[in-house]
Curated annotation (Swiss-Prot):
The lineage of its organism: Eukaryota, Metazoa, Chordata, Craniata, Vertebrata. InterPro entries: Glyas_Bleomycin-R_OHBP_Dase, Glyas_Fos-R_dOase_dom, GlyoxalaseI/FosfomycinResist, VOC. The gene is glod5. This is Glyoxalase domain-containing protein 5. Pfam families: Glyoxalase (PF00903). Signal peptide: none annotated. Residues 33-153 form the VOC domain.
Length: 160
């Protein structure tokens, strides 16, 4: 008898080399958090300027002269389009990211700062769902047109 995942894969015409990912087995490990992600950007300087001046991240340089933006316990590694480090995404492209960043600073203060920096708010404040609860968000674009969401957890707002 075929396992159900193989039967469904056949019906959905999933390529046979992907069928193994449809197994019911669980991995013997647990992912705890996101350490870093990579943004492919058109200009390192413009990106670093935006994320440090507008969002308050810290620019760092690590081995090989690579650039990153640090905040909290995470970082965003930066790859310049056409000069990516290996290994890299299959199709690295500026402007394809959608990031949600959490702050405890009231969004009214965030919006005032964005206006002072000349960064238009694309949408918000609006209610959304975050990883661990309801959030209120404002949206903007970075220099590569990535969608950047800055949010407060509603539970943090109610505590104040």
């Amino acid at each position: 008898m075929f396992p159900l995942c193989r039967l469904l894969a056949c019906r959905a015409q999933v390529p046979s080399h992907l069928v193994r990912y449809l197994s019911d087995s669980q991995p013997p490990f647990c992912i705890q958090r996101l350490d870093h992600l990579v943004l492919t950007v058109r200009s390192l300087d413009r990106t670093i300027n935006f994320y440090t001046k507008v969002l308050g991240m810290e620019a760092t340089t690590f081995k090989g002269g690579r650039k990153a933006l640090s905040f909290g316990m995470q970082k965003i590694n930066l790859h310049e389009a056409g000069k990516e480090f290996e290994p890299k995404a299959s199709v690295p492209s500026p402007g394809s990211a959608d990031l949600c960043l959490i702050t405890e600073t009231p969004l009214s203060t965030v919006v005032q700062h964005l206006k002072a920096c000349g960064v238009p708010v694309e949408e918000g404040p609006v209610s959304r769902t975050g990883a661990v609860g309801e959030i209120i968000s404002v949206y903007m674009r970075d220099p590569d047109q990535n969608l950047i969401e800055v949010s407060n957890y509603e539970s943090d707002i109610k505590k104040k």
